[in-house]
Amino acid sequence: IFKDKSKLKDVPEEGELVRWMQQQGQIYNTFGLYQTKEYGLLSEWKKIGERKEGGQCRPFNKMTVEGNVITKEGVDEQGKALAVREKAWYKYVINKNYKQIPQIYSFEPFAMQKINGKNIYQYDLQLEQQKEVIDKLVKCLKELHTFGKAPADYFSIYEAYLGKTFKRLEKIRDLVPFANEKYIVVNGRKCRNVFFYKDELIKKFENYKCNEFVFLHGDNTFSNMMLDDETMSPVLIDPRGYFGYTEMYGDVVYDWAKLYYSIVGNYDQFNLKRFRLQINENDVMLDIESNHWEAVEDYYLDLIKDEVDKNTIKLIHAIIWLSLTTYAWEDYDSICGAFYNGLYYLEEVL
C-alpha cells in the first residue's frame, strides 16, 4: 500500500489516521474490501467469538449447520486427509455400539447430529459437579480403550512425541523471540530452551514404557467433548484417528494427557485467543484465561494412576504444547504462546 515508509514518518501517536492522511495532500489509489466487516471496537469482535464458540473449526475445515444437522467438509488437503480418518473412527465405534458420540446421518456428505449441549469448558460447575463429570469422562474413555489393542510401535511413539514436535519447532525457530537463548524466563520461571536441550528431552524417552497400543480418541480436549444438557452425559466429537504412523491405535497416555491439557493447561481458552502475551526485554509473561477446572487435577490423576504416573502426564502435556506451535499457524501470538507455555511445563519434568 505504501511503497515508501517515509510517507508515514510524521504519523502522530494519537488521533484518526484517515483524517491525518487527508491533510497530507497525497493522492491514494483505493480498492474495495468486499465481504469484510469493520468492527471498530475489540468488544464487538469478542462478541462474534462468543456467538461462534462451540461451533468453531480449524482453518482446514468447513462446517455448516442446518437445524439439528451439522455437515463437515475438509477444505484443503490436510482437512480432507483428517476427514478420512475421522469417518473411519466413527464407523469403527458405531460397530462397537458406542453411545458417547453424535448420531451420524451420512458419511457422504459427512452429516451428524447437532448436540443439545455445550463444550465442557463452557459450563460453570461446582467442584463436586466437576468431579462427577470427570468420573464420566474417564469411564467413557476407558470404555473406548477396550475396543481394541495392537502391538506398541516405537516409531509411532517417537514420531508422535518427538519427531513431529522437533519438525514443527524448527519451522518457527526464526519467528519466536529468545529462541536462540539457552534459557528463557517464562512467568518468572527460568526455563531450559528445548532447542539447546533436545538431547535431554530425547533421553526422557529412552526408557519410555508402552507395552501395547489401545484404541484412542486422540484429541479429547474439552473443545472436542460436549455434555448433553438433558442427561449431562459426555459426547465425544472430532476424533484424531491416528497416533504417529499408526491408524486408530496408540499410547493410552496420549488420551489422558489431552484431557489434562484442558483441565490444567486451559488449552480451550488459549485456542479461543483468550490469553495475553507480553514479550519484554528479558522475559516473557503469558496469562491464559482459566477453564476453572484446575481444582480437580489431583482427583483426575488419582482416577488414572493405574495407567499413568503424574510425571509422565506432565511430560506429554509439555510436548503437546510444543507441538501446537505450527498447528496455530494462523496467529503469531499463538505460535509464540504455545512455545513458551511448552517450555514452562517442560521445565517441571526435564
Pin down the residues of each PLM region.
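Active-site donor/metal-binding and catalytic loop motifs
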Residues: G32-S43, I70-T71, A111-G117, I237-Y242
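Conserved HxN/HPN-centered segment at the entrance to the catalytic loop
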Residues: I94-P109
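Conserved kinase catalytic-core helix
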Residues: Y92-Y98, I120-Y183, V194-K209, L216, ...
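Helix-rich C-terminal or lid/interface subdomains of diverse kinases
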Residues: G25, L41, E132-K136, K167-F178, ...
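Catalytic-core segments of class I nucleotidyltransferases/pyrophosphorylases
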Residues: I1-I48
